[in-house]
Amino acid sequence: MPEVGLSVFLRIGPFVHGEVRNGGFPDWIIEREKEGMAIRCNNEEYLGYVRRFWKKVYAQVDGCMEKDGGPVIGIQIENEYGHVGGLQGPEGEAHIRTLTAMAKEIGFDVPLYTATGWGGAASAICFRSWAATVKHHGSENVRD
């Protein structure tokens, strides 16, 4: 993407939602959940699968981080955690912190964030965050 000037926000999940099948989880993870494996929490077995997946993702984007001159400027951890599945409160916060530490350890060295617009989300105190107040009046600036 550097050749066309596009920046990338990479969504590594492990749950990405995006209105895709199983929120992006492979069928076999859902089968393991049905067999009793807890997902989207600090279950060691689940975290092992996340680590293995993220290492494979990182192998494909190694050298593509902004610090390396690449287009990846941010990485989304999880999605709608605490609203569409996941834990709330201290357990949810602990899980988001675990995922964040794992991503950094693997080498995802760009700003990390998560996305949710719902109350009860565990992420609010887990990331340094910012908010912008945007004046939006319908189609006012569409032609600019």
Regions found by a protein language model. Name each.
Residues 1-109:
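Active-site mouth of glycoside hydrolases
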Residues 89-144:
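Noncatalytic carbohydrate-binding groove/subsite architecture in carbohydrate-active enzymes
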